[in-house]
Amino acid sequence: MALTKADLAENLFETLGYSKRDAKETVEVFFEEVRKALENGEQVKLSGFGNFDLREKNERPGRNPKTGEDIPISARRVVTFRPGQKLKARVENIKIEK
């Protein structure tokens, strides 16, 4: 099971008494701010949760798994997430059911 934006909005509705419309808009605004910051090359630091960073990946050699042909994997920018200490501590001993 995955946590969705709809789940987050529902939680705001239930715990803070937001209207459903305001809860959904709040979640959308939050994620839009994160997107904008990353698009502008900024780090996103969420205290007690973790950091989102942009990393540049250089071009590197790769291989087509079907044909075995060598192909270059182009340089690109990727988003990485590094969990903070508080998040790590909270999930450290959780048993995951499959």
Swiss-Prot record:
PROSITE patterns: HISTONE_LIKE. SUPFAM superfamilies: IHF-like DNA-binding proteins. CDD domains: IHF_A. SMART domains: BHL. Keywords: DNA recombination, DNA-binding, Transcription, Transcription regulation, Translation regulation. GO terms for molecular function: DNA binding; structural constituent of chromatin. Residues 53-69 have a biased composition (Basic and acidic residues). InterPro entries: Hist_DNA-bd, Histone-like_DNA-bd_CS, IHF-like_DNA-bd_dom_sf, IHF_alpha. Residues 53-72 are annotated as: Disordered. It holds the Pfam family Bac_DNA_binding. Gene3D superfamilies: IHF-like DNA-binding proteins. This protein is one of the two subunits of integration host factor, a specific DNA-binding protein that functions in genetic recombination as well as in transcriptional and translational control. HAMAP family: IHF_alpha. This is Integration host factor subunit alpha. It comes from Vibrio atlanticus (strain LGP32).
